[in-house]
Amino acid sequence: MIHAILKMGDPRLLRVAAPVERYDTPELRALIDDMFETMAHAQGVGLAAPQIGVDLQLVIFGFERNDRYPDAPAVPRTILCNPVIEPLSDEMEDGWEGCLSVPGLRGLVPRYRHIRYSGYDPAGQRIEREAEGFHARVVQHECDHLIGRLYPTRIRDLTKFGYTEVLFPEMDPNAD
């Protein structure tokens, strides 16, 4: 089922999400299926449960190709419960981000370039991976939703925040 995606200004996006406590349940599997369907419908590269009003530490991400990020390399399809992120260096990298909860806007956001992330898959099996570049950016962006943070709060220079159609007139106007 496709869910409505909450938009910036909705107080539910500012909450700290609760940990997933029960794995491998029909409810969790149905939620994950709904999240993937919602993400695909919105042409997203990731989605956090709080974005559809579900107060759980659950994120999904991954794509082969995405019109919203045409130059981005593929990111493996991942389901991550109760994620933890560890920067593997102090190196930060600025990159343009958008968000399904902040439609039509883009901002230049600093993120750690190289991270390790861990958590659990839907069956409760531990996952641990390293990521860099755009993959690392997507993980950090989605996990921010679990602590009630949206990317505009990370922007250092607000002259690098605006409407996608103005900042990137060459992009498909339906991409955000």
From Swiss-Prot:
GO biological process, any: co-translational protein modification
SUPFAM superfamilies xref list: Peptide deformylase
Domain of life: Bacteria
Cofactor(s) the protein requires to work: Fe(2+)
Cofactor note: Binds 1 Fe(2+) ion.
InterPro entries associated with the record: Peptide_deformylase, Peptide_deformylase_sf
Keyword terms: Hydrolase, Iron, Metal-binding, Protein biosynthesis
GO MF entry, a single one: peptide deformylase activity
Name of the protein: Peptide deformylase 1
Source organism of the structure: Bordetella pertussis (strain Tohama I / ATCC BAA-589 / NCTC 13251)
